[in-house]
Amino acid sequence: MPKSFRHLVQALACLALLASASLQAQESRLDRILESGVLRVATTGDYKPFSYRTEEGGYAGFDVDMAQRLAESLGAKLVVVPTSWPNLMRDFADDRFDIAMSGISINLERQRQAYFSIPYLRDGKTPITLCSEEARFQTLEQIDQPGVTAIVNPGGTNEKFARANLKKARILVHPDNVTIFQQIVDGKADLMMTDAIEARLQSRLHPELCAVHPQQPFDFAEKAYLLPRDEAFKRYVDQWLHIAEQSGLLRQRMEHWLEYRWPTAHGK
């Protein structure tokens, strides 16, 4: 065998070995979950009807419900990973979870770092305020006035939307998204701008509060599940969601959690 040809064969063999090692190193997230039998799901526990941490320390809500069903479809054990809106993307970068399910809105900032599943809900920001003040806060122009206090929870799209649209009104940051609506009832803030689905639910839980035109929110947003950049896992989650939607399961479970008897005393 000519020397040059022998060198070529050796080089090709080395490349084949490197390619094989690379493929093994690039084991998909889906394969990892199937092999470990564990699905790590991040959730905030502060966002009814999607995710709520109970007084007993467990979690309830639409996305917690769906997380359990996703784990079962994979033959895996569900492990809930607590996170928060300010820490969500940091926890993602640190690989603390396999998927985040917590009423998460799709936005380009998050999309630059992660994948999203197909959307499961269309939504948008709308005000919630005392029913006696509903006519006063119909537009962003009416809201963005000196003397108006808009309350926000830190680190999520609610704060981002408020800071982008309010230049004259005062923005009050409240650290607890569970008790934040009671602050409006208690007169510590005039309103909050949040997702229409949350505004509707909280107006039911707090009879003093009214969701302002939730059927016509100020902007457009979709909710989806936050995923690592793994094509195989994304395709699996997308197909699982598609089946749940087409079978009516998504609608049925959402109706259940919207009608659920959530604790209401001071937002707890």
Swiss-Prot record:
Summarizing the function annotation, the protein's role is:
Forms alternative pathway for phenylalanine biosynthesis. Can catalyze two reactions: prephenate dehydratase and arogenate dehydratase. May have a role in chemotaxis or transport.
Signal peptide as annotated in the record:
1-25
Entry similarity comment: Belongs to the bacterial solute-binding protein 3 family.
Catalytic reactions of this protein:
prephenate + H(+) = 3-phenylpyruvate + CO2 + H2O; L-arogenate + H(+) = L-phenylalanine + CO2 + H2O
| A Pfam family this chain is assigned to | SBP_bac_3
> According to its UniProt record, where is this protein located?
Periplasm
* Record-linked SUPFAM superfamilies: Periplasmic binding protein-like II (SSF53850)
Q: Which CDD domains match?
A: PBP2_PheC
Q: What is its EC number?
A: 4.2.1.51, 4.2.1.91
What main location does UniProt list?
periplasm
Keywords, sorted A to Z: Amino-acid biosynthesis, Aromatic amino acid biosynthesis, Lyase, Multifunctional enzyme, Periplasm, Phenylalanine biosynthesis, Signal
Q: Name one GO molecular function term.
A: arogenate dehydratase activity
What metabolic or biological pathway is this protein involved in? Amino-acid biosynthesis; L-phenylalanine biosynthesis; L-phenylalanine from L-arogenate: step 1/1; Amino-acid biosynthesis; L-phenylalanine biosynthesis; phenylpyruvate from prephenate: step 1/1
Please name the PROSITE patterns in this protein's record.
SBP_BACTERIAL_3
State any GO CC term: periplasmic space
Give the multimer and partner information. Homodimer.
Q: Which InterPro entries match?
A: PheC_PBP2, SBP_3_CS, Solute-binding_3/MltF_N
Site: Important for catalysis. Where?
179
The processes (GO biological process) annotated in the record are: L-phenylalanine biosynthetic process
Entry-linked Gene3D superfamilies: Periplasmic binding protein-like II
Could you tell me which SMART domains the record lists for this protein?
Answer: PBPb (SM00062)
Q: What is this protein called?
A: Cyclohexadienyl dehydratase
